[in-house]
Amino acid sequence: MSESLKILNNIRTLRAQARETSLETLEEMLEKLEVVVNERREEEQAMQAEIEERQQKLQKYRELLIADGIDPTDLLEAAGASKTGRAKRAARPAKYSYVDDNGETKTWTGQGRTLAVIKRAIEEEGKSLEDFLI
């Protein structure tokens, strides 16, 4: 809630402000506030009417499906089966081969950070990345 709304919601603050404001101004403010409240009520009623209309339509369609001998859950399952998820991409093939600290030969695709073993070999042993190509 914003500070201005907190002030409007506090009766003590309103009374203090009302003492310094003319009655005509207070009545104008009251009229404007009533207009805003009425608009908001109408919006809420319209939204509620839309929700009720949607529920009635859903119930109508449910009844039509049942009358035709179709179970609504079967329809949902059929709709769910037709949707396809995001396809996984294929794993990238290995591009580099190296021997780790345990003496095992391993591979690396070349994606991500340079592996510590390869980085150490490049920096300390003077090798290049091309030396590790498969």
Swiss-Prot record:
GO terms for molecular function: bent DNA binding; DNA-binding transcription repressor activity; minor groove of adenine-thymine-rich DNA binding; protein dimerization activity; structural constituent of chromatin; transcription cis-regulatory region binding. It is found in: Cytoplasm, Nucleoid. InterPro entries: H-NS-like_N, H-NS_C_dom, H-NS_C_dom_sf, Histone_HNS, Histone_HNS_N. Residues 111-116 bind DNA. Its main location: cytoplasm. A DNA-binding protein implicated in transcriptional repression and chromosome organization and compaction. Binds nucleation sites in AT-rich DNA and bridges them, forming higher-order nucleoprotein complexes and condensing the chromosome. As many horizontally transferred genes are AT-rich, it plays a central role in silencing foreign genes. A subset of genes are repressed by H-NS in association with other proteins. Homodimer that oligomerizes on DNA into higher-order complexes that form bridges between disparate regions of DNA compacting it. Interacts with YmoA and other similar proteins. Keywords: Cytoplasm, DNA-binding, Repressor, Transcription, Transcription regulation. Belongs to the histone-like protein H-NS family. This is DNA-binding protein H-NS. The gene is hns. Pfam families: Histone_HNS, Histone_HNS_N. GO terms for cellular component: cytosol; nucleoid; protein-DNA complex. NCBIfam families: PRK10947.1. It comes from Proteus vulgaris. It comes from the Bacteria.
